[in-house]
Every structure is written in structure tokens, then in C-alpha cells.
Amino acid sequence: MSRKDYRDITLTEFRELKSVPGSIVVDVREKWEYEEFNEGGLNIPLSEIREKRPLLASYGNIVVVCTNGTRSRVAAMDYCRIPEWSDKNIFHLEGGLLEAE
């Protein structure tokens, strides 16, 4: 079985991709961080990504973001390990939302 990889994307690519049908943005920051500033999408803190996977099952493109890219990289790697998600495209916002502020 081959290992699935995620793809790093730029802020420009992120803003284009989040409007593509079948795409979902997953912000893995804590709720208070999300409430301070966000670029939309679904807020699922990193500690909850495994239990909330079913919320993402219907999407083909999953774009994971956080403040600086560290937590979102962990989440993207975790999502790539799900055998049932081999047909999904996993994206990671390189540099995080600091680039957007």
C-alpha cells in the first residue's frame, strides 16, 4: 500500500481552493483562536480531529489551516493515514493564517 501525501499550498492557492465545490477548510486552532480571526470553514481543534472525521467524509478536498502551519501539518499527516480517504485531496496552508492577517 502506498502512502498518501498532502500538498502544501500558498495563501493565494488557499483562497482559490476554498471556493471550489467539494472543498472544506478545517481550522485546527482552538475555539478562542478561531473566534479572534478566521478565514471561514469548520473549526475542529487538533485534539478533536479523529473523533470528528465523519464531518468531513463527504468532501473531496480537505484544506487544513492553523496559525503558523505547525498544527495543521500534524492534522494533514493524520488525515493522509486514513485508508478510506485515499481518494481525497489533502492540502496544508504553508505558513498558516499568519500570512492572511
Summary of predicted features, one role per range:
Residues 65:
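Short, surface-exposed ligand- or partner-binding patches at beta-edge/loop junctions that are enriched
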